[in-house]
Amino acid sequence: MLSNSQGQSPPVPFPAPAPPPQPPTPALPHPPAQPPPPPPQQFPQFHVKSGLQIKKNAIIDDYKVTSQVLGLGINGKVLQIFNKRTQEKFALKMLQDCPKARREVELHWRASQCPHIVRIVDVYENLYAGRKCLLIVMECLDGGELFSRIQDRGDQAFTEREASEIMKSIGEAIQYLHSINIAHRDVKPENLLYTSKRPNAILKLTDFGFAKETTSHNSLTTPCYTPYYVAPEVLGPEKYDKSCDMWSLGVIMYILLCGYPPFYSNHGLAISPGMKTRIRMGQYEFPNPEWSEVSEEVKMLIRNLLKTEPTQRMTITEFMNHPWIMQSTKVPQTPLHTSRVLKEDKERWEDVKEEMTSALATMRVDYEQIKIKKIEDASNPLLLKRRKKARALEAAALAH
């Protein structure tokens, strides 16, 4: 039974992220003869949602909660609920209240202004089975998963232009996240859902269970990374987290263009040692007939997303500025094999999804292990030389 939290304290706000500072506009004594060229744009200026108010009253005051399961997130079931006043349908996700759950809700709330990210409507703090829980009310996405929609389209050909438009939609979600210093880190087929079954439905990114804030914390002293030395301004942990999303874009784009994944397990395991090796070594191909009509430019775009070295992967800005994405209306309407292959391999699709889930989990673990060493532990030869000299001077001073 759901009930309101103990006490009737006012709603608890999440702090709203500060807007990025705007550079002052210099005053011009005379208008220039020609307007100056615009500065190169790294990210569009996005509006970030203001602070989230967590409601303390019982959710059943406002919504009718049903037992209809809409889906399974990494942290539990998503249920169908109805607004009692408007009868509008929504999705309810329940998280046991803890700092990690609050971070997930906060990051998702910040991002839910984006048209290609599932929108949070309300958040409640209620007791459920004697435990304090966060109840997240989200818009209901009725259109099903991205690849199920392509599987179910019958004889209608799926084209390269459609693949480009889909990748642009997913890219817009990632661009929004990266621009406000959030890495999703779990971009995969089952987290990409359509708003409805209609042809004009919008594709949206869901499930922020692994999302992470990526604000860089540069130190005055140069840290050392394992397994190699590099300055923090060149490589911060945030580069790894964001590169995880770019790798996902590469895998999804590959599947969209042919119907099967670039990496696969030979032995029916969720992720076999061989598959891990192929991912780490970047071993994949563009075999015919599925790839025969796909341009070399598009294959190169995939190669730049699936680079084995995370820091060499394309950034989201580079991806969104690529002609295949930016000018998606000009992409040829070449019929692809995707729909046929997805239908033929339908029984294998759950394995494909499981493999990608495992690959992303492995990647997150690998990147978490790249920790900054303390300055005392650093093996920087210059620091070692300076320390040796300091110790020699200290010893000389003590001797006198």
UniProtKB/Swiss-Prot annotation:
Residues 366-390 are annotated as: p38 MAPK-binding site. Heterodimer with p38-alpha/MAPK14; this heterodimer forms a stable complex: molecules are positioned 'face to face' so that the ATP-binding sites of both kinases are at the heterodimer interface. Interacts with PHC2. Interacts with HSF1. It comes from Homo sapiens (Human). Keywords: ATP-binding, Cytoplasm, DNA damage, Isopeptide bond, Kinase, Nucleotide-binding, Nucleus, Phosphoprotein, Serine/threonine-protein kinase, Transferase, Ubl conjugation. Staurosporine binds at residues 139-141. Sumoylation inhibits the protein kinase activity. Phosphorylated and activated by MAP kinase p38-alpha/MAPK14 at Thr-222, Ser-272 and Thr-334. This is MAP kinase-activated protein kinase 2. Changing residue 272 to A: Strong decrease in kinase activity. The lineage of its organism: Eukaryota, Metazoa, Chordata, Craniata, Vertebrata. GO terms for biological process: 3'-UTR-mediated mRNA stabilization; cellular response to vascular endothelial growth factor stimulus; DNA damage response; inflammatory response; inner ear development; intracellular signal transduction; leukotriene metabolic process; macropinocytosis. It is found in: Cytoplasm; Nucleus. Belongs to the protein kinase superfamily. CAMK Ser/Thr protein kinase family.
